[in-house]
């Protein structure tokens, strides 16, 4: 008979193993044997989704489950509580009491995802004065009043998504940030509804400890402008997605290692001289970055930046991933001119059928001295061949050029190889065709 090694493990180790499972799967182990019957109750984490409870008695079963859990008196051992809550009308107030109780008993990780027609007011004072919370993630809750005290001395991770605020939305967010003295990771996804405000909103993100920051606003047609000011001297990783902001002002970002710019500055104001200056200042503020992902379409209507020399120098940038269109090669050329030490270049190429490709006119310094790896995704045989030949003919130290086709475009592979007629400037360069 095979030996049951798992049953020989101590309870402390088994509960850590069960912690890696979702709670609904952890509960299923209670039927294995008498020893396993209540073992799941000792797991220091609880992950719940109210829709997983059986319909039509979902609400009653959920309430009984939570009552049993609390009666077992394991609340003091719980370190992580995650709940995805879909309306259980009879339990909403009790849920808030439960969360408050768990926080008072030393909870470290709290994730609350509310899916209700009426948002839940999530302003319990003890939550924002917790001495043990390390991570806090809130989705679709209400924080309308900025008149509350925040003191979270251990909080390192904060995520706010789709939060409902009153007119003091930015102040609420700023208060949360300022009350986290060791905050390292901040993610703001639609942190307040920009459609409901009639005046310019200014969000200040100021932190001496922040290392990673993600900002994502939804795109709305009818909305007010907003501005973001970021002051974070230890920031290493930054992502700005689809914000269409009026301006993004950055200060003290000398530690910045990587940035992902998916944002489009206010598209109605690209011809505004002030906006051009704001955008130039933004690029200057991130010029120490080493790794960048950018959509060159973000620069498309800032026509002065299509000329070499008018983009700030990125002396430290060695890895660039850019999404570009066939008509924006002049922007790529200008951007490469500002990256004299670039080593790795990844291009996601998009074809504009009604636009002609603009030829390169210069050879940037990085092609002459530093560029070693180029990858072009989704190349099109007619519009991309000039670009490919340009890199092969002008990159003196290029080691590898990879053309990555999708499954649907792999039929062009053979004909594409025939079109590559240029002489490689770098004799050791490999041309790789892949999917």
Curated annotation (Swiss-Prot):
The keyword Cell cycle does not apply. Pfam families: F-box, FBD, LRR_At5g56370. SUPFAM superfamilies: F-box domain (SSF81383), RNI-like (SSF52047). Keywords: Leucine-rich repeat, Repeat. Residues 355-405 form the FBD domain. It comes from Arabidopsis thaliana (Mouse-ear cress). LRR repeats lie at residues 88-114, 138-162, 165-190, 191-217, 250-275, 324-349. Residues 3-49 form the F-box domain. This is F-box/FBD/LRR-repeat protein At5g44980. InterPro entries: F-box-like_dom_sf (IPR036047), F-box_AtFBL13-like (IPR053781), F-box_dom (IPR001810), FBD (IPR006566), FBL13/AtMIF1-like (IPR050232), LRR_dom_sf (IPR032675), LRR_FXL15/At3g58940/PEG3-like (IPR055411). The keyword Hydrolase does not apply.
């Amino acid at each position: 008979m095979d030996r049951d090694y798992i049953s020989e493990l101590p309870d402390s180790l088994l509960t850590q193993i069960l912690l890696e499972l979702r709670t609904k799967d952890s509960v299923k182990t209670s039927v294995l044997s008498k020893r396993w019957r209540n073992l799941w109750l000792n797991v220091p984490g609880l992950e719940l989704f109210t829709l997983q409870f059986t319909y039509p008695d979902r609400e009653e079963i959920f309430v009984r489950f939570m009552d049993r859990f609390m009666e077992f008196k394991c609340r003091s051992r719980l370190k992580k509580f995650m709940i995805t809550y879909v309306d259980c009308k009879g339990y909403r107030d009790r849920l808030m009491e439960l969360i408050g109780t768990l926080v008072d008993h030393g909870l470290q990780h709290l994730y609350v995802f509310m899916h209700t027609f009426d948002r839940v007011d999530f302003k319990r004072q003890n939550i924002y004065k917790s001495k043990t919370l390390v991570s806090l993630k809130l989705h679709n809750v209400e924080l309308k009043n900025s008149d509350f005290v925040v003191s979270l001395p251990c909080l390192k991770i904060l995520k706010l998504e789709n939060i409902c605020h009153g007119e003091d939305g930015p102040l609420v967010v700023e208060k949360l940030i300022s009350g986290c003295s060791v905050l390292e990771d901040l993610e703001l996804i639609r942190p307040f509804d920009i459609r409901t405000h009639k005046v310019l909103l200014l969000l200040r993100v100021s932190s001496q400890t922040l290392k990673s920051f993600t900002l994502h606003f939804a795109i709305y047609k009818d909305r007010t402008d907003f501005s973001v000011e970021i002051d974070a001297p230890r920031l290493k990783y930054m992502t700005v997605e689809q914000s269409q902001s009026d301006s993004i002002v950055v200060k003290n970002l000398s530690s910045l290692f990587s940035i992902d710019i998916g944002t489009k500055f206010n598209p109605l104001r690209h011809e505004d001289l002030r906006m051009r200056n704001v955008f130039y200042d933004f690029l200057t503020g991130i010029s120490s970055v080493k790794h960048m992902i950018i959509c060159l379409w973000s620069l498309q209507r800032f026509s002065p930046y299509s000329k070499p020399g008018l983009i700030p120098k990125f002396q430290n940038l060695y890895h660039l991933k850019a999404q570009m269109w066939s008509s924006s090669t002049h922007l790529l050329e200008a951007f490469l001119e500002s990256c004299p030490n670039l080593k790795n270049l990844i291009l996601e190429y998009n074809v504009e059928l009604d636009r002609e490709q603009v030829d390169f006119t210069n050879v940037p310094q990085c092609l002459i001295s530093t560029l070693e790896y180029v990858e072009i995704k989704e190349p099109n045989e007619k519009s991309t061949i000039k670009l490919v030949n340009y890199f092969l003919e002008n990159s003196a130290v290029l080691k590898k050029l990879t053309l990555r086709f999708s499954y649907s475009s792999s039929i062009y592979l053979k004909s594409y190889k025939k079109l590559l007629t240029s002489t490689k400037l770098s004799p050791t360069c490999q041309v790789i065709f892949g999917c």
